[in-house]
């Protein structure tokens, strides 16, 4: 599995392009805002002769789908959003105002098939399963590849921290409970690719993350 991270937009969100030897790929959380960021992602896909087959959202905060209109136009892939987060996605203008307290351009194309706990995403010879992880948003999820021991955690789990819960729909203890269950379930050598910041491992977070003690 090949994982390419693109830190994008003013909030330094991590967009991931995940591919394998078949050259099929999934795009996770394309928050590209500036034209040069969008071009950089497209160039990587083109230079590596990749075929994107899905655009997945870990949750529906605007900084994670700023580039969704570009991906939909270029590859014909509407973003797939966790079902409980559809109200956030559909009313993005109100979401932006409530979080930033001012308006900013954020085009959101019609969403594709909802992501549910039963969803299984396949690309090439790999599959991603959905692990619900609410708390940062009502419908936040992680995407897990058991074969490669890789977790894409969105804004639920960060290196030595967790996602904010003071936005509309957030709940601190819901998130902590979900993450404590998560780290008890997954192998310690699972690599965690978060929505912002550096990658980590489940073992490191079990050992060092102050929100997950006990």
Per-segment meaning from a language model:
Residues 1-48, 142-153:
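Conserved beta-strand hairpin/beta-sheet module of binuclear metal-dependent hydrolase folds
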Residues 6, 18, 119-125:
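Short acidic-hydrophobic surface loop/beta-edge motif
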Residues 6-7, 110-112, 132-134:
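Short Gly/Pro-enriched turn/cap motifs at secondary-structure boundaries
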Residues 16, 113, 118-119, 141, ...:
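Residue-level detector of beta-strand structural context in well-folded domains
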Residues 32-33, 94-98, 126-214:
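Metallo-beta-lactamase
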Residues 33-36, 42-122, 207-211:
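Active-site HxH/HxHxD metal-binding segment of metal-dependent hydrolases
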């Amino acid at each position: 599995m090949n994982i390419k991270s693109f830190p994008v937009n003013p909030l330094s969100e991590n967009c991931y392009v995940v591919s394998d030897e078949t050259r099929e790929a999934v795009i996770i959380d394309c928050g590209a805002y500036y034209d040069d960021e969008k071009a950089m992602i497209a160039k990587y896909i083109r230079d590596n002769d990749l075929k994107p087959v899905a655009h997945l959202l870990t949750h529906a905060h605007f900084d994670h789908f700023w580039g969704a209109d570009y991906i939909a136009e270029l590859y014909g892939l509407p973003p797939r959003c966790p079902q409980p987060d559809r109200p956030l996605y559909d009313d993005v203008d109100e979401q932006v105002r409530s979080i930033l307290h001012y308006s900013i351009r954020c085009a959101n194309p019609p969403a594709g098939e909802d992501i549910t706990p039963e969803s299984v995403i396949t690309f090439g010879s790999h599959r991603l399963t959905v692990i619900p992880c609410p708390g940062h948003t009502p419908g936040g999820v992680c995407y897990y590849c058991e074969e490669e021991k890789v977790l894409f955690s969105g804004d639920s789990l960060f290196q030595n921290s967790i996602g904010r819960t003071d936005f509309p729909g957030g709940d601190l203890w819901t998130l902590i409970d979900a993450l404590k269950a998560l780290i008890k379930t997954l192998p310690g050598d699972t690599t965690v690719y978060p929505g912002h910041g550096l990658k980590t491992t489940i073992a490191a977070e079990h050992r060092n993350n102050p929100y997950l003690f006990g």
